[in-house]
């Protein structure tokens, strides 16, 4: 995992490096389906494809936990809507580029300090459920 956040899988705890002076909270979105134009082969460029995206967004949720106000946190409905709209009008040759694009978008637009982004193409090859890329980035 990345420097900014490591998960203790047996205990479900998150740890941070010395670069962050407090524990990091994570908002997650799993198995989001979105349409985008992706691929290098003519058959892939002929139509939009569905990709599956899972996100972990490292932000402090302390204010929202205290206030119970959506304005004090990342609104995941807004994340989903904006990502779907952005990706619907975009083309990427590689999953790596698409994944970087999403990570950068989250870091720049949602005050995230750390993100983990997983993007998969579905049913691309016989006998393979999905192929994909997972990255972690931080500010």
Outline where the language-model segments fall.
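N-terminal, polar/charged subdomain of small-to-medium soluble alpha/beta proteins
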Residues: 5-139
């Amino acid at each position: 995992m990345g420097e900014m956040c490591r998960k203790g899988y047996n205990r479900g705890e998150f740890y941070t490096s010395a670069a962050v002076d407090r524990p990091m909270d994570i908002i997650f979105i799993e198995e989001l389906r979105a349409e985008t134009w992706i691929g290098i082969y003519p058959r892939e460029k002929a139509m939009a494809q569905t990709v599956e995206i899972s996100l972990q967004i490292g932000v402090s949720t302390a204010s929202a936990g205290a206030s119970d106000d959506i304005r004090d946190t990342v609104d995941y409905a807004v994340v989903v809507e904006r990502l779907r709209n952005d990706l619907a009008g975009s083309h990427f040759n590689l999953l790596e580029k698409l994944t970087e694009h999403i990570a950068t978008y989250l870091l720049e637009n949602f005050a995230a300090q750390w993100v983990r982004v997983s993007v998969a193409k579905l049913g691309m090859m016989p006998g393979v459920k999905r192929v994909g890329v997972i990255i972690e980035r931080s500010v």
